[in-house]
Amino acid sequence: MKVSTLIIVSIPIVSGLQIKDTVGTTTENTFWYQLFGTPSRSQPAAVAATAAGTEVQGFTPISTSSSSSSSSAAPWYQGLFGVGRTTLGQVTTPSRTSTTTTTSNPIAPTTSIANSNNLFGTDTAPTTTTTTNARSRSRSTPVTVSGDNVLTLFGNPNLSTGNDQSNSVSKTTAETTTTSSAPSSSSRVQPTVINGGGSDGVLTLFGNSEALSNFDSTTVVDSDSTARITPIASASASSGSSTKDNDSDSSSARGIKSIPNSSEFLASLINGLGSGGGGNGSGSNTNSYKNHSTTSTTSKYFNSSSTATKLSSSKSIYSNSTTSRSSLSVSSSSTDGGGGANLFGSLLNSVAAVSRTLAAESTLSTGTTTTSDSANSNTKDYSSYSGTITSFPSTTGSLSGDGNKLIGGNKYLISFMWTNLILTMIMLFT
C-alpha cells in the first residue's frame, strides 16, 4: 500500500522536473527552480593587468604590473533553503593576487676633469666627455660581498653572508665611460692593485706579487661589488708592471711598488721599501657611487693598498625586500722628509694626519614582490546576505512554445504537488 501510494505521489513530482517556461531553455527555468527560488550566479572576474614604463637618459624605467582573478558560483541549494541558510555543495572559489613593483633612483653621471699643467702660464679649460648607461634588475640571490682588496692572512677569499635564496636583492649596475682632453694636460686615474693571477690582489702575510697600473680606463661601478678599473693597455715587467708618471717624463713609479714573491708583509713593515722619483709616494683614491663607496689608500712606506668598504643588509620578512647601505671612513697621512723609510719613521711623520668620514647612505633600488593565494574552500560565507525568499518569481509577457506554462491553471498543480509531498511524509513516518 505504501509503495503503490509512493509511486502515485511521485509521478507528478518527477514530471515537475520537466516543466519549463519555454522549450529549449536551461534548467534554471525549470519548475523546481521557480518553486523554491531561482539561484544567483556570479561570473568569474576578468583578469586585469597594467604596465607602465618611462625611459629617460640617466634614469631607470619604473614598471608596475598587477593581476587579479576570482570566481564564485552560488549553489542551487541557496534557492531551496533560502539565502544564507546553507553552505552545502559550494563551488571551490580560488583567488590569486600578484603585485610586482620595481623602483630605481636616477643615476647621476660621473665627471672626471683632467689636471692642467701649462708651461707658458695660459691654462686652458679641459674638455670632458661623459657617457652614462644605467640599467636595473631585481632577482632573488644570496647577498655576496666580494673579497677584492681585503687584508687577509692567507689569500683572497670571497665572503658570503648566506645562501638563503629567499633574499631579494635589487642590483643596479652603472657603466660610466669618461674621456678627458686638454692642451698640455694629463688625465690620471687611480690604479688598482693587480696580482700575478690577473685578479684584484690582496696583501697577505706571506708575500704577494703586486703591481701598479695607471692608464686610460673604463670604470665600472656595481652596487654590490668593489669598483674595478678595466685596463685598456699596460706595460708589464718581470716582477709586475712598470708605470710612467703622468706628471713628468720620469720612468720611476709613484705610489705602490711591486713586492716580489720572496718578500713578506712583515719585512716590508720593518725595513720599508722607499719609493724613488718625485712626491711623497702617498695617494688616496675614493670611488663613491650612491649607496656603495670604495676607497683605496696607498703609501710608499707600507707598500700596501687598503680598501674600506662596509655593506649592511636589511631584510624584511613580509615584503621580501632587501635594502643595501654602505658607509666608509678614510684616513690619509702626508709624510714629507725625515724619519727614514720604515714603519717608525712613517708613524712619527704622520702627526698632521687628516681624517674624514664619508657617508653614502641611500636606497638605490628596492624590489618588492607580493603574492597571495587563498586556500581552496568548499564553503562560502553568507554573512553578507540577509533575509529569506518571500515570494516566487512571476512570469510577465507572453510565452510561446509547447511546454507547460507556470501561469493560470498551473498554480493548482503547484498546490497539488505540495499536498502530495505532505501526504507522503505522513505516510512514511506513520
Curated annotation (Swiss-Prot):
Propeptide segments, given as residue ranges: 402-430
Main subcellular localisation: membrane
Lipid-modified sites (GPI-anchor amidated glycine): G401
Superkingdom field: Eukaryota
Induction of synthesis: Induced upon high iron conditions.
Signal peptide range in chain numbering: 1-16
Compositionally biased tracts (Low complexity): 92-112, 122-135, 168-187, 233-253, 314-335
Compositionally biased intervals (Polar residues): 141-167, 289-302
Keywords assigned: Cell adhesion, Cell membrane, Glycoprotein, GPI-anchor, Lipoprotein, Membrane, Signal, Virulence
Compartments where located: Cell membrane
GO biological process: cell adhesion
GO cellular component terms listed in the entry, alphabetical order: plasma membrane; side of membrane
Region Disordered: start-end pairs: 88-195, 232-257, 278-302, 314-336
Membrane topology: Lipid-anchor; GPI-anchor
Stated role: Putative adhesin which is involved in cell adhesion and virulence.
Protein name: Probable GPI-anchored adhesin-like protein PGA32
